[in-house]
Amino acid sequence: SADIVKKLWDNPAL
């Protein structure tokens, strides 16, 4: 499941 990873990476959290 790379959906959660992609969403987290796409998020401006970093």
Curated annotation (Swiss-Prot):
<dbReference type="GO" id="GO:0006935">
    <property type="term" value="P:chemotaxis"/>
</dbReference>
<keyword id="KW-0007">Acetylation</keyword>
<dbReference type="GO" id="GO:0090729">
    <property type="term" value="F:toxin activity"/>
</dbReference>
<dbReference type="GO" id="GO:0043306">
    <property type="term" value="P:positive regulation of mast cell degranulation"/>
</dbReference>
<keyword id="KW-0145">Chemotaxis</keyword>
<feature type="modified residue" description="N-acetylserine">
    <location>
        <position position="1"/>
    </location>
</feature>
<dbReference type="GO" id="GO:0005576">
    <property type="term" value="C:extracellular region"/>
</dbReference>
<keyword id="KW-0467">Mast cell degranulation</keyword>
<keyword id="KW-0964">Secreted</keyword>
<keyword id="KW-0800">Toxin</keyword>
<comment type="function">
    <text>Venom component which lacks hemolytic or antibiotic properties, but produces an inflammatory response via mast cell degranulation and produces a chemotactic effect on leukocytes.</text>
</comment>
<protein>
    <recommendedName>
        <fullName>Polybine-1</fullName>
    </recommendedName>
</protein>
